[in-house]
Amino acid sequence: MESLYRVPFTVLECPNLKLKKPSWLHMPSAMTVYAMVVVSYFLITGGIIYDVIVEPPSVGSMTDEHGHQRPVAFLAYRVNGQYIMEGLASSFLFTMGGLGFIILDRSNTPNIPKLNRFLLLFIGFVCVLLSFFMARVFMRMKLPGYLMG
């Protein structure tokens, strides 16, 4: 494999560049990187790529038995399609569940007061459980009859 990498460099010669980092460029803090990761996770799980390509409506409408148009947030019976609000709501739940796990992890740090540890555990469990059960409710709205036992 080394010999294959060596073949192009028998003909090409790498330039001798002396690059230095610009003075205004600094290493971002850990919380800045974490915030960028959470925001990108929110956008990707929300289906931002799908929303840009397909351009679905933000909410849909359904005609009830009296002939009136009712707004609906979930595109029922379609696994491969979504409204924008549906994607954002689901993405919020996934992000809330992920943050709940991170909060649960932070409750294990040493030297944390007992009340703060209890509050972190409570908030973490609430975030994880609420996100899990709301995702199940969303699945029932998306696919009626699914997960019914």
Swiss-Prot record:
Its main location: membrane. The lineage of its organism: Eukaryota, Metazoa, Chordata, Craniata, Vertebrata. PANTHER family: OLIGOSACCHARYLTRANSFERASE COMPLEX SUBUNIT OSTC. Pathway: Protein modification; protein glycosylation. Residues 1-32, 105-117 are cytoplasmic. Coiled coil: none annotated. Keywords: Membrane, Transmembrane, Transmembrane helix. It is found in: Membrane. Specific component of the STT3A-containing form of the oligosaccharyl transferase (OST) complex that catalyzes the initial transfer of a defined glycan (Glc(3)Man(9)GlcNAc(2) in eukaryotes) from the lipid carrier dolichol-pyrophosphate to an asparagine residue within an Asn-X-Ser/Thr consensus motif in nascent polypeptide chains, the first step in protein N-glycosylation. N-glycosylation occurs cotranslationally and the complex associates with the Sec61 complex at the channel-forming translocon complex that mediates protein translocation across the endoplasmic reticulum (ER). One of its GO terms (biological process) is protein glycosylation. This is Oligosaccharyltransferase complex subunit ostc-A. The gene is ostc-a. It holds the Pfam family OST3_OST6. GO terms for cellular component: oligosaccharyltransferase complex. Signal peptide: none annotated. The keyword Mitochondrion does not apply. Belongs to the OSTC family.
